[in-house]
């Protein structure tokens, strides 16, 4: 997907998102020479936008880094990654899929009433193992500006403390650095980018999707935005 093959609108969107991403990376020194960075691809708009932004940035960024994409397949039926594989080929990014039986364990064997916590723990375990095998030293998560605000609200409402994501976090156990390059981009801008670039988004097949504390925080913030815009 070379820029000269895109429409003027698409080029503008690429340059804008790349600019925001680079500003975050430079502000918090997220990337060093020789890094091997993985992007965790869920199939959602956020992770695909991050993949695109980093793939574009890699072309001219002064610090040279390798980039791969990786998806943890939880074992849902009809989870088709064909279009994501094609996007990765177009962006010259190696793509890896980690097949698991997490869905079966969480929903059928354990029958978890609150499945998100166990699922996240198992998913991260499978992801970190693969990253270790591939000798990646950094993982880029697609948390955007709205995610940071929602996490702050969730910690306040449900934990009684003030907390949100850090721009980068070192994980001692897995010897990995987590970076969050989309922190300056809001969700509306990501939606526009996804639509303009026709990114191959996969709808989440998870039966618990839409019933999380994060979704509650998202809706609460949307109501606040209606009442007091800006």
Kindly give the residue locations of the regions a language model identified.
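Single conserved hydrophobic/aromatic residue that forms the stacking wall/gate
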Residues: 1-15
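ATP/NTP-dependent adenylation/nucleotidyl-transfer catalytic domains that generate, transfer
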Residues: 20-39, 163-230
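ATP-dependent adenylation/pyrophosphate-handling site
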Residues: 27, 33-82, 166-172
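ATP-dependent adenylate-handling ligase core
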Residues: 59-64, 72-130, 160-162, 166-169
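Residue-level detector of anion-binding/catalytic polar loops
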Residues: 94, 137, 200
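Short, ordered loop/turn segments at secondary-structure junctions
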Residues: 100-102, 144-146, 206-207
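Short secondary-structure transition/capping segments
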Residues: 108-111, 151-154, 213-218
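Active-site adenylate/phosphate-handling loop in enzymes that bind or generate adenylated species
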Residues: 117-188
């Amino acid at each position: 997907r070379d820029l000269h093959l895109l429409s003027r609108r698409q080029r503008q969107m690429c340059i804008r998102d790349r600019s925001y991403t680079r500003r975050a990376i430079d502000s918090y020194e997220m990337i060093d020479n020789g890094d091997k960075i993985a992007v965790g691809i869920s199939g959602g708009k956020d992770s695909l936008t991050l993949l695109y932004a980093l793939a574009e940035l890699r072309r001219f960024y002064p610090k040279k880094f390798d980039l791969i994409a990786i998806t943890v397949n939880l074992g849902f039926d009809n989870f088709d990654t064909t279009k994501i594989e094609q996007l990765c080929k177009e962006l010259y990014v190696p793509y890896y899929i980690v097949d698991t039986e997490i869905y079966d364990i969480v929903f059928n064997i354990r029958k978890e009433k609150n499945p998100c916590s166990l699922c996240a723990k198992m998913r991260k375990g499978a992801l970190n193992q693969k990253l270790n095998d591939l000798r990646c030293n950094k993982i880029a998560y697609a948390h955007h500006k709205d995610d940071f605000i929602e996490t702050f609200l969730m910690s306040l409402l449900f934990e009684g403390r003030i907390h949100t994501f850090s721009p980068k976090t070192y994980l001692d156990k897995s010897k990995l650095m987590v970076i969050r390059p989309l922190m300056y981009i809001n969700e509306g801008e990501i939606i526009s980018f996804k639509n303009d670039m026709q990114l191959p988004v996969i709808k989440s097949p998870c039966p618990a999707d839409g019933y999380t504390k994060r979704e509650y925080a998202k809706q609460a913030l949307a109501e606040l935005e209606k009442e007091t815009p800006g």
